[in-house]
Protein backbone atom coordinates (compact mmCIF):
# COMPACT_ATOMS: atom_id res chain seq x y z
CA UNK A 1 0.00 0.00 0.00
CA UNK A 2 1.06 3.63 -0.57
CA UNK A 3 2.62 5.09 2.62
CA UNK A 4 2.16 1.75 4.43
CA UNK A 5 4.83 2.60 7.02
CA UNK A 6 3.08 5.85 7.91
CA UNK A 7 -0.26 4.05 8.15
CA UNK A 8 1.22 1.39 10.42
CA UNK A 9 2.76 4.02 12.72
CA UNK A 10 -0.48 5.98 13.01
CA UNK A 11 -2.57 2.87 13.66
CA UNK A 12 -0.13 1.73 16.38
CA UNK A 13 -0.28 5.14 18.07
CA UNK A 14 -4.09 5.15 18.05
CA UNK A 15 -4.26 1.60 19.42
CA UNK A 16 -2.00 2.54 22.34
CA UNK A 17 -4.33 5.38 23.21
CA UNK A 18 -7.46 3.22 22.86
CA UNK A 19 -6.05 0.46 25.11
CA UNK A 20 -5.01 2.88 27.87
CA UNK A 21 -6.87 2.39 31.16
CA UNK A 22 -7.38 6.12 31.54
CA UNK A 23 -7.16 8.65 28.73
CA UNK A 24 -5.55 11.60 30.48
CA UNK A 25 -3.43 14.51 29.29
CA UNK A 26 -0.25 12.42 29.35
CA UNK A 27 -1.78 9.75 27.07
CA UNK A 28 -3.06 12.40 24.66
CA UNK A 29 0.31 14.17 24.51
CA UNK A 30 2.07 10.84 23.85
CA UNK A 31 -0.36 10.12 21.01
CA UNK A 32 0.14 13.54 19.43
CA UNK A 33 3.94 13.25 19.77
CA UNK A 34 3.90 9.87 17.98
CA UNK A 35 1.70 11.28 15.20
CA UNK A 36 4.05 14.26 14.86
CA UNK A 37 7.10 11.96 14.62
CA UNK A 38 5.39 9.76 12.01
CA UNK A 39 4.52 12.74 9.82
CA UNK A 40 8.00 14.25 10.12
CA UNK A 41 9.34 10.92 8.87
CA UNK A 42 7.27 11.43 5.71
CA UNK A 43 8.82 14.89 5.17
CA UNK A 44 5.61 16.73 6.01
CA UNK A 45 6.27 20.42 6.63
CA UNK A 46 6.63 21.02 10.43
CA UNK A 47 4.38 24.08 10.14
CA UNK A 48 1.56 21.92 8.72
CA UNK A 49 2.09 19.34 11.48
CA UNK A 50 2.00 21.93 14.26
CA UNK A 51 -1.22 23.40 12.85
CA UNK A 52 -2.77 19.93 12.69
CA UNK A 53 -1.77 19.08 16.28
CA UNK A 54 -3.17 22.39 17.56
CA UNK A 55 -6.47 21.74 15.76
CA UNK A 56 -6.72 18.29 17.37
CA UNK A 57 -6.00 19.75 20.82
CA UNK A 58 -8.79 22.32 20.39
CA UNK A 59 -11.28 19.59 19.47
CA UNK A 60 -10.42 17.32 22.41
CA UNK A 61 -9.97 19.91 25.17
CA UNK A 62 -11.01 17.98 28.30
CA UNK A 63 -12.85 20.94 29.81
CA UNK A 64 -15.16 21.20 26.79
CA UNK A 65 -16.11 17.49 26.52
CA UNK A 66 -19.67 16.90 27.86
CA UNK A 67 -20.34 13.97 30.20
CA UNK A 68 -21.29 10.75 28.44
CA UNK A 69 -19.14 11.42 25.38
CA UNK A 70 -16.75 8.61 24.43
CA UNK A 71 -13.40 10.37 24.79
CA UNK A 72 -11.45 7.69 22.89
CA UNK A 73 -13.82 7.93 19.92
CA UNK A 74 -13.68 11.73 19.97
CA UNK A 75 -9.87 11.65 19.82
CA UNK A 76 -9.81 9.08 17.00
CA UNK A 77 -12.41 11.06 15.04
CA UNK A 78 -10.44 14.28 15.53
CA UNK A 79 -7.21 12.68 14.28
CA UNK A 80 -9.10 11.25 11.30
CA UNK A 81 -10.61 14.63 10.40
CA UNK A 82 -7.32 16.50 10.69
CA UNK A 83 -5.43 13.95 8.59
CA UNK A 84 -8.04 14.51 5.88
CA UNK A 85 -7.60 18.28 6.17
CA UNK A 86 -3.84 17.81 5.83
CA UNK A 87 -4.11 16.29 2.33
CA UNK A 88 -7.37 17.88 1.13
CA UNK A 89 -7.03 21.11 -0.91
CA UNK A 90 -10.83 21.56 -0.73
CA UNK A 91 -10.90 22.54 -4.39
CA UNK A 92 -12.94 20.83 -7.10
CA UNK A 93 -11.06 19.55 -10.15
CA UNK A 94 -12.28 19.47 -13.74
CA UNK A 95 -14.07 16.22 -14.60
CA UNK A 96 -14.50 14.98 -18.18
CA UNK A 97 -17.91 13.93 -19.50
CA UNK A 98 -18.53 11.04 -21.85
CA UNK A 99 -19.45 12.08 -25.37
CA UNK A 100 -18.13 15.63 -24.95
CA UNK A 101 -14.59 16.30 -26.19
CA UNK A 102 -12.19 17.72 -23.62
CA UNK A 103 -8.50 18.51 -23.99
CA UNK A 104 -6.18 17.77 -21.07
CA UNK A 105 -2.70 19.29 -21.30
CA UNK A 106 -0.03 17.48 -19.25
CA UNK A 107 2.93 19.48 -17.89
CA UNK A 108 5.82 18.75 -15.54
CA UNK A 109 9.56 18.47 -15.05
CA UNK A 110 11.58 15.83 -16.88
CA UNK A 111 11.80 12.57 -14.96
CA UNK A 112 8.52 12.95 -13.09
CA UNK A 113 6.89 10.17 -15.11
CA UNK A 114 4.68 12.38 -17.26
CA UNK A 115 4.73 10.28 -20.44
CA UNK A 116 4.07 7.06 -18.52
CA UNK A 117 1.28 8.74 -16.56
CA UNK A 118 -0.44 9.85 -19.78
CA UNK A 119 -0.66 6.21 -20.86
CA UNK A 120 -1.97 5.16 -17.45
CA UNK A 121 -4.58 7.90 -17.58
CA UNK A 122 -5.65 6.99 -21.12
CA UNK A 123 -6.09 3.33 -20.15
CA UNK A 124 -7.93 4.31 -16.95
CA UNK A 125 -10.51 6.27 -18.94
CA UNK A 126 -10.69 3.68 -21.70
CA UNK A 127 -11.60 1.00 -19.15
CA UNK A 128 -14.44 3.22 -17.99
CA UNK A 129 -16.08 3.69 -21.36
CA UNK A 130 -14.38 6.85 -22.64
CA UNK A 131 -12.66 7.25 -26.02
CA UNK A 132 -9.23 8.66 -25.11
CA UNK A 133 -6.42 9.60 -27.49
CA UNK A 134 -2.87 10.86 -26.90
CA UNK A 135 -0.83 13.56 -28.64
CA UNK A 136 2.98 13.49 -28.43
CA UNK A 137 3.99 17.16 -28.35
CA UNK A 138 7.19 16.65 -26.35
CA UNK A 139 9.66 17.66 -29.06
CA UNK A 140 12.51 18.32 -26.60
CA UNK A 141 13.35 14.94 -25.04
CA UNK A 142 15.03 12.34 -27.24
CA UNK A 143 12.89 9.23 -27.51
CA UNK A 144 9.70 10.87 -26.23
CA UNK A 145 7.89 10.28 -29.55
CA UNK A 146 8.81 6.56 -29.65
CA UNK A 147 8.01 6.00 -25.97
CA UNK A 148 4.52 7.48 -26.13
CA UNK A 149 3.77 5.82 -29.47
CA UNK A 150 4.75 2.40 -28.08
CA UNK A 151 2.85 2.92 -24.82
CA UNK A 152 -0.27 4.03 -26.68
CA UNK A 153 -0.12 0.95 -28.90
CA UNK A 154 0.14 -1.34 -25.87
CA UNK A 155 -2.79 0.40 -24.21
CA UNK A 156 -4.84 0.27 -27.40
CA UNK A 157 -5.45 4.02 -27.66
CA UNK A 158 -4.95 6.28 -30.73
CA UNK A 159 -1.68 8.22 -30.96
CA UNK A 160 -0.74 11.35 -32.92
CA UNK A 161 2.76 12.70 -33.38
CA UNK A 162 5.06 14.19 -36.03
CA UNK A 163 8.43 12.53 -35.61
CA UNK A 164 10.71 15.10 -37.25
CA UNK A 165 8.76 18.20 -36.14
CA UNK A 166 10.52 20.44 -33.59
CA UNK A 167 7.65 22.88 -33.01
CA UNK A 168 5.48 21.59 -30.11
CA UNK A 169 2.73 24.11 -30.89
CA UNK A 170 2.29 22.70 -34.40
CA UNK A 171 2.21 19.08 -33.19
CA UNK A 172 -0.22 19.82 -30.36
CA UNK A 173 -2.55 21.86 -32.59
CA UNK A 174 -2.69 19.27 -35.38
CA UNK A 175 -3.14 16.43 -32.91
CA UNK A 176 -6.04 18.10 -31.11
CA UNK A 177 -7.65 19.04 -34.44
CA UNK A 178 -7.36 15.44 -35.68
CA UNK A 179 -8.92 13.84 -32.61
CA UNK A 180 -11.70 16.42 -32.37
CA UNK A 181 -12.74 15.36 -35.89
CA UNK A 182 -12.61 11.71 -34.83
CA UNK A 183 -14.91 12.46 -31.86
CA UNK A 184 -12.53 11.30 -29.13
CA UNK A 185 -13.91 12.57 -25.84
CA UNK A 186 -10.58 12.81 -23.96
CA UNK A 187 -7.48 14.17 -25.73
CA UNK A 188 -4.32 13.93 -23.61
CA UNK A 189 -1.49 16.19 -24.80
CA UNK A 190 2.07 15.40 -23.70
CA UNK A 191 4.37 18.45 -23.53
CA UNK A 192 8.10 18.98 -23.10
CA UNK A 193 9.69 18.82 -19.67
CA UNK A 194 12.99 20.12 -18.37
CA UNK A 195 15.39 19.11 -15.62
CA UNK A 196 14.49 22.28 -13.75
CA UNK A 197 11.99 25.10 -13.77
CA UNK A 198 13.03 27.85 -16.19
CA UNK A 199 11.57 30.69 -18.21
CA UNK A 200 12.04 28.83 -21.49
CA UNK A 201 9.96 25.88 -20.27
CA UNK A 202 7.15 28.09 -19.00
CA UNK A 203 7.15 30.16 -22.21
CA UNK A 204 6.78 26.99 -24.32
CA UNK A 205 3.97 25.69 -22.11
CA UNK A 206 2.15 28.99 -22.41
CA UNK A 207 2.45 28.91 -26.22
CA UNK A 208 1.00 25.39 -26.39
CA UNK A 209 -1.75 26.37 -23.97
CA UNK A 210 -2.73 29.39 -26.06
CA UNK A 211 -2.81 27.28 -29.24
CA UNK A 212 -4.91 24.32 -28.06
CA UNK A 213 -6.97 26.03 -25.33
CA UNK A 214 -7.15 23.00 -23.00
CA UNK A 215 -10.13 22.41 -20.76
CA UNK A 216 -7.71 21.65 -17.94
CA UNK A 217 -3.93 21.65 -17.37
CA UNK A 218 -2.62 18.75 -15.29
CA UNK A 219 0.72 19.03 -13.51
CA UNK A 220 2.53 15.69 -13.08
CA UNK A 221 5.07 15.70 -10.26
CA UNK A 222 7.40 13.22 -8.56
CA UNK A 223 6.25 12.36 -5.03
CA UNK A 224 9.84 11.67 -3.96
CA UNK A 225 10.58 15.39 -3.59
CA UNK A 226 8.47 15.63 -0.43
CA UNK A 227 7.62 19.08 0.95
CA UNK A 228 9.60 20.72 -1.89
CA UNK A 229 6.46 19.96 -3.89
CA UNK A 230 4.93 23.15 -2.51
CA UNK A 231 7.27 25.47 -4.42
CA UNK A 232 7.18 23.37 -7.58
CA UNK A 233 3.39 23.08 -7.69
CA UNK A 234 2.96 26.79 -6.96
CA UNK A 235 5.42 27.82 -9.70
CA UNK A 236 3.61 25.78 -12.35
CA UNK A 237 0.22 26.92 -11.11
CA UNK A 238 1.25 30.58 -11.35
CA UNK A 239 2.78 30.09 -14.83
CA UNK A 240 0.05 28.15 -16.66
CA UNK A 241 -2.96 28.04 -14.34
CA UNK A 242 -2.63 24.38 -13.38
CA UNK A 243 -6.09 22.94 -12.78
CA UNK A 244 -5.07 19.73 -11.00
CA UNK A 245 -2.10 17.59 -9.98
CA UNK A 246 -1.07 13.95 -10.36
CA UNK A 247 1.60 12.76 -7.91
CA UNK A 248 3.71 9.83 -9.14
CA UNK A 249 6.05 7.29 -7.51
CA UNK A 250 4.29 7.24 -4.15
CA UNK A 251 4.96 3.51 -3.76
CA UNK A 252 8.72 3.59 -3.31
CA UNK A 253 9.59 6.67 -1.24
CA UNK A 254 9.19 7.93 2.33
CA UNK A 255 8.42 11.50 1.27
CA UNK A 256 4.94 10.88 -0.14
CA UNK A 257 3.09 12.38 2.80
CA UNK A 258 5.15 15.54 2.47
CA UNK A 259 4.34 15.80 -1.23
CA UNK A 260 0.60 15.25 -0.71
CA UNK A 261 0.33 17.81 2.09
CA UNK A 262 2.50 20.34 0.24
CA UNK A 263 0.43 20.18 -2.94
CA UNK A 264 -2.80 20.40 -0.93
CA UNK A 265 -1.47 23.59 0.68
CA UNK A 266 -1.29 25.23 -2.76
CA UNK A 267 -5.06 24.59 -3.12
CA UNK A 268 -4.40 22.53 -6.25
CA UNK A 269 -6.69 19.48 -6.37
CA UNK A 270 -4.86 16.14 -6.48
CA UNK A 271 -6.77 13.95 -8.93
CA UNK A 272 -4.64 10.80 -9.20
CA UNK A 273 -1.67 9.19 -7.50
CA UNK A 274 0.78 6.75 -9.08
CA UNK A 275 1.15 3.59 -7.01
CA UNK A 276 3.58 1.52 -9.09
CA UNK A 277 5.19 0.99 -12.48
CA UNK A 278 2.45 -1.16 -14.04
CA UNK A 279 0.06 0.52 -16.45
CA UNK A 280 -2.95 -0.05 -14.14
CA UNK A 281 -1.19 1.22 -11.01
CA UNK A 282 -2.87 4.59 -10.78
CA UNK A 283 -5.61 5.55 -8.32
CA UNK A 284 -8.14 8.35 -8.34
CA UNK A 285 -7.35 10.44 -5.27
CA UNK A 286 -9.94 11.31 -2.66
CA UNK A 287 -8.68 12.68 0.66
CA UNK A 288 -11.18 10.85 2.88
CA UNK A 289 -10.79 7.56 1.02
CA UNK A 290 -7.00 7.89 1.19
CA UNK A 291 -6.97 8.41 4.96
CA UNK A 292 -9.45 5.59 5.52
CA UNK A 293 -7.17 3.15 3.70
CA UNK A 294 -4.14 4.60 5.49
CA UNK A 295 -5.72 3.79 8.86
CA UNK A 296 -7.10 0.40 7.76
CA UNK A 297 -10.71 1.58 8.09
CA UNK A 298 -11.91 0.46 4.66
CA UNK A 299 -13.04 2.80 1.89
CA UNK A 300 -16.80 2.68 1.34
CA UNK A 301 -16.75 5.64 -1.03
CA UNK A 302 -14.01 4.12 -3.18
CA UNK A 303 -15.62 0.71 -3.49
CA UNK A 304 -18.99 2.28 -4.29
CA UNK A 305 -17.46 4.31 -7.12
CA UNK A 306 -15.64 1.24 -8.41
CA UNK A 307 -18.87 -0.73 -8.27
CA UNK A 308 -20.72 1.97 -10.20
CA UNK A 309 -18.10 1.88 -12.97
CA UNK A 310 -18.19 -1.91 -12.90
CA UNK A 311 -21.99 -2.18 -13.08
CA UNK A 312 -22.18 -0.09 -16.26
CA UNK A 313 -20.68 -2.78 -18.48
CA UNK A 314 -22.94 -5.16 -20.41
CA UNK A 315 -21.13 -8.29 -19.20
CA UNK A 316 -22.02 -7.43 -15.60
CA UNK A 317 -25.71 -7.16 -16.44
CA UNK A 318 -25.58 -10.55 -18.17
CA UNK A 319 -23.93 -12.08 -15.12
CA UNK A 320 -26.60 -10.63 -12.80
CA UNK A 321 -29.32 -12.16 -14.99
CA UNK A 322 -27.61 -15.57 -14.86
CA UNK A 323 -27.18 -15.30 -11.09
CA UNK A 324 -30.88 -14.59 -10.64
CA UNK A 325 -31.76 -17.56 -12.82
CA UNK A 326 -29.17 -19.86 -11.23
CA UNK A 327 -27.42 -20.33 -14.59
CA UNK A 328 -24.02 -18.72 -13.94
CA UNK A 329 -21.54 -19.78 -16.62
CA UNK A 330 -17.77 -20.06 -16.45
CA UNK A 331 -17.61 -17.29 -19.10
CA UNK A 332 -19.54 -14.92 -16.78
CA UNK A 333 -16.93 -15.49 -14.10
CA UNK A 334 -14.04 -15.00 -16.51
CA UNK A 335 -15.40 -11.71 -17.89
CA UNK A 336 -15.96 -10.23 -14.44
CA UNK A 337 -12.52 -11.36 -13.27
CA UNK A 338 -11.04 -9.64 -16.33
CA UNK A 339 -13.02 -6.45 -15.62
CA UNK A 340 -11.83 -6.42 -12.01
CA UNK A 341 -8.23 -6.62 -13.15
CA UNK A 342 -8.79 -3.74 -15.59
CA UNK A 343 -10.39 -1.53 -12.95
CA UNK A 344 -7.35 -1.67 -10.68
CA UNK A 345 -5.23 -3.83 -8.48
CA UNK A 346 -7.23 -6.46 -6.63
CA UNK A 347 -5.13 -5.85 -3.53
CA UNK A 348 -6.25 -2.22 -3.56
CA UNK A 349 -9.88 -3.33 -3.81
CA UNK A 350 -9.39 -5.50 -0.72
CA UNK A 351 -7.95 -2.45 1.10
CA UNK A 352 -11.09 -0.53 0.19
CA UNK A 353 -13.19 -3.25 1.79
CA UNK A 354 -10.91 -3.24 4.84
CA UNK A 355 -10.81 -7.01 5.43
CA UNK A 356 -7.77 -8.68 7.02
CA UNK A 357 -8.75 -12.33 6.53
CA UNK A 358 -5.99 -14.32 4.72
CA UNK A 359 -8.25 -15.10 1.77
CA UNK A 360 -8.64 -11.36 1.15
CA UNK A 361 -4.95 -10.41 1.35
CA UNK A 362 -3.96 -8.41 -1.74
CA UNK A 363 -0.86 -10.33 -2.78
CA UNK A 364 -2.51 -13.70 -2.27
CA UNK A 365 -5.66 -12.91 -4.20
CA UNK A 366 -3.84 -11.29 -7.14
CA UNK A 367 -1.56 -14.30 -7.57
CA UNK A 368 -4.51 -16.65 -7.28
CA UNK A 369 -6.60 -14.74 -9.82
CA UNK A 370 -3.71 -14.71 -12.31
CA UNK A 371 -3.55 -18.51 -12.06
CA UNK A 372 -7.31 -18.69 -12.58
CA UNK A 373 -7.06 -16.52 -15.72
CA UNK A 374 -4.38 -18.80 -17.19
CA UNK A 375 -6.70 -21.78 -16.71
CA UNK A 376 -9.73 -19.93 -18.09
CA UNK A 377 -7.77 -18.86 -21.18
CA UNK A 378 -7.13 -22.55 -21.91
CA UNK A 379 -10.84 -23.40 -22.11
CA UNK A 380 -12.90 -23.91 -25.27
CA UNK A 381 -16.03 -21.86 -26.02
CA UNK A 382 -18.20 -24.85 -25.16
CA UNK A 383 -16.53 -25.25 -21.78
CA UNK A 384 -16.78 -21.52 -21.01
CA UNK A 385 -20.51 -21.52 -21.74
CA UNK A 386 -21.08 -24.43 -19.35
CA UNK A 387 -21.36 -24.48 -15.57
CA UNK A 388 -18.67 -25.06 -12.95
CA UNK A 389 -20.61 -28.08 -11.69
CA UNK A 390 -20.42 -29.71 -15.13
CA UNK A 391 -16.66 -29.18 -15.24
CA UNK A 392 -16.16 -30.63 -11.75
CA UNK A 393 -18.03 -33.78 -12.77
CA UNK A 394 -15.78 -34.36 -15.79
CA UNK A 395 -12.37 -35.59 -14.61
CA UNK A 396 -10.98 -35.98 -18.14
CA UNK A 397 -11.66 -32.29 -18.89
CA UNK A 398 -10.02 -31.28 -15.61
CA UNK A 399 -6.90 -33.26 -16.54
CA UNK A 400 -6.87 -31.78 -20.07
CA UNK A 401 -7.17 -28.23 -18.68
CA UNK A 402 -4.34 -28.84 -16.23
CA UNK A 403 -2.09 -30.06 -19.06
CA UNK A 404 -3.14 -27.29 -21.47
CA UNK A 405 -2.65 -24.49 -18.93
CA UNK A 406 0.47 -25.91 -17.31
CA UNK A 407 -1.19 -25.76 -13.88
CA UNK A 408 -1.82 -28.37 -11.21
CA UNK A 409 -5.08 -30.39 -11.19
CA UNK A 410 -5.67 -29.08 -7.66
CA UNK A 411 -5.65 -25.48 -8.95
CA UNK A 412 -8.11 -26.31 -11.74
CA UNK A 413 -10.49 -27.92 -9.24
CA UNK A 414 -10.12 -24.93 -6.91
CA UNK A 415 -11.19 -22.53 -9.68
CA UNK A 416 -14.43 -24.38 -10.37
CA UNK A 417 -15.11 -24.90 -6.67
CA UNK A 418 -14.88 -21.11 -6.21
CA UNK A 419 -17.37 -20.46 -9.02
CA UNK A 420 -19.69 -23.16 -7.72
CA UNK A 421 -19.49 -21.76 -4.17
CA UNK A 422 -20.32 -18.25 -5.42
CA UNK A 423 -23.46 -19.49 -7.18
CA UNK A 424 -24.45 -21.50 -4.10
CA UNK A 425 -24.11 -18.38 -1.92
CA UNK A 426 -26.49 -16.53 -4.22
CA UNK A 427 -28.88 -19.50 -4.37
CA UNK A 428 -29.16 -19.43 -0.56
CA UNK A 429 -30.57 -15.91 -0.66
CA UNK A 430 -34.37 -15.63 -0.41
CA UNK A 431 -36.09 -15.11 -3.77
CA UNK A 432 -37.01 -11.51 -2.92
CA UNK A 433 -33.40 -10.68 -2.09
CA UNK A 434 -32.11 -12.46 -5.20
CA UNK A 435 -34.51 -10.43 -7.35
CA UNK A 436 -32.79 -7.23 -6.18
CA UNK A 437 -29.36 -8.25 -7.48
CA UNK A 438 -28.02 -5.45 -9.63
CA UNK A 439 -30.70 -2.98 -8.47
CA UNK A 440 -28.69 -0.02 -7.18
CA UNK A 441 -31.88 1.80 -6.16
CA UNK A 442 -33.08 -0.84 -3.71
CA UNK A 443 -32.71 -0.04 0.00
CA UNK A 444 -31.18 -3.01 1.86
CA UNK A 445 -32.63 -4.68 4.93
CA UNK A 446 -29.29 -5.03 6.71
CA UNK A 447 -30.43 -7.37 9.50
CA UNK A 448 -31.91 -9.89 7.06
CA UNK A 449 -28.91 -9.68 4.79
CA UNK A 450 -26.51 -10.21 7.71
CA UNK A 451 -28.29 -13.41 8.73
CA UNK A 452 -28.09 -14.78 5.20
CA UNK A 453 -24.43 -13.86 4.75
CA UNK A 454 -23.15 -15.34 8.03
CA UNK A 455 -23.29 -18.81 6.49
CA UNK A 456 -21.43 -17.71 3.36
CA UNK A 457 -18.19 -16.19 4.62
CA UNK A 458 -15.08 -18.03 5.85
CA UNK A 459 -14.31 -18.52 9.53
CA UNK A 460 -12.34 -15.66 11.03
CA UNK A 461 -14.33 -12.83 9.41
CA UNK A 462 -15.81 -10.98 12.39
CA UNK A 463 -19.16 -9.21 12.73
CA UNK A 464 -17.77 -5.78 11.90
CA UNK A 465 -16.06 -7.09 8.77
CA UNK A 466 -19.24 -8.89 7.75
CA UNK A 467 -21.30 -5.73 8.11
CA UNK A 468 -18.77 -3.78 6.09
CA UNK A 469 -18.73 -6.37 3.31
CA UNK A 470 -22.52 -6.30 3.23
CA UNK A 471 -22.42 -2.54 2.68
CA UNK A 472 -20.01 -3.02 -0.18
CA UNK A 473 -22.32 -5.56 -1.80
CA UNK A 474 -25.17 -3.08 -1.60
CA UNK A 475 -22.97 -0.35 -3.08
CA UNK A 476 -22.13 -2.68 -5.92
CA UNK A 477 -25.78 -3.25 -6.71
CA UNK A 478 -25.99 -6.59 -4.90
CA UNK A 479 -28.58 -5.07 -2.61
CA UNK A 480 -31.02 -6.41 -0.07
CA UNK A 481 -34.75 -6.73 0.28
CA UNK A 482 -35.60 -3.29 1.51
CA UNK A 483 -38.57 -1.39 0.14
CA UNK A 484 -38.15 0.54 -3.03
CA UNK A 485 -38.65 4.23 -3.05
CA UNK A 486 -41.74 5.77 -4.57
CA UNK A 487 -41.69 6.36 -8.27
From Swiss-Prot:
Residues that, per the record, bind GTP: 108-115, 190-194, 248-251
Region G-domain, annotated ranges: 1-295
Class of enzymatic activity (EC top level): hydrolase
Molecular function terms, GO-annotated: 7S RNA binding; endoplasmic reticulum signal peptide binding; GTP binding; GTPase activity
Catalytic activity: GTP + H2O = GDP + phosphate + H(+)
Keywords, comma-separated and alphabetical: Cytoplasm, Endoplasmic reticulum, GTP-binding, Hydrolase, Nucleotide-binding, Ribonucleoprotein, RNA-binding, Signal recognition particle
Chain spans, region M-domain: 296-487
InterPro entries linked: P-loop_NTPase, Signal_recog_part_SRP54_M_sf, Signal_recog_particl_SRP54_hlx, Signal_recog_particle_SRP54_M, SRP/SRP_N, SRP54, SRP54_euk, SRP54_GTPase_dom
Gene Ontology, cellular component aspect: cytosol; endoplasmic reticulum; signal recognition particle, endoplasmic reticulum targeting
Cell cycle recorded as keyword: no
Top-level division of the source organism's lineage: Eukaryota
Main location: cytoplasm
Any single biological process term in GO: SRP-dependent cotranslational protein targeting to membrane, translocation
Gene3D superfamilies reported in the protein's UniProt record: P-loop containing nucleotide triphosphate hydrolases, Signal recognition particle SRP54, nucleotide-binding domain, Signal recognition particle, SRP54 subunit, M-domain
Enzyme Commission number, as recorded: 3.6.5.4
One family name in Pfam for this protein: SRP54_N
Subcellular location: Cytoplasm; Endoplasmic reticulum
Protein family per UniProt: Belongs to the GTP-binding SRP family. SRP54 subfamily.
PANTHER family, sorted: SIGNAL RECOGNITION PARTICLE 54K PROTEIN SRP54, SIGNAL RECOGNITION PARTICLE SUBUNIT SRP54
Record text about domains: The NG domain, also named G domain, is a special guanosine triphosphatase (GTPase) domain, which binds GTP and forms a guanosine 5'-triphosphate (GTP)-dependent complex with a homologous NG domain in the SRP receptor subunit SRPRA. The two NG domains undergo cooperative rearrangements upon their assembly, which culminate in the reciprocal activation of the GTPase activity of one another. SRP receptor compaction upon binding with cargo-loaded SRP and GTPase rearrangement drive SRP-mediated cotranslational protein translocation into the ER.
Biological role: Component of the signal recognition particle (SRP) complex, a ribonucleoprotein complex that mediates the cotranslational targeting of secretory and membrane proteins to the endoplasmic reticulum (ER). As part of the SRP complex, associates with the SRP receptor (SR) component SRPRA to target secretory proteins to the endoplasmic reticulum membrane. Binds to the signal sequence of presecretory proteins when they emerge from the ribosomes. Displays basal GTPase activity, and stimulates reciprocal GTPase activation of the SR subunit SRPRA.
Subunit structure: Component of a signal recognition particle (SRP) complex that consists of a 7SL RNA molecule of 300 nucleotides and six protein subunits: SRP72, SRP68, SRP54, SRP19, SRP14 and SRP9.
Entry protein name: Signal recognition particle subunit SRP54
Gene of this entry: SRP54
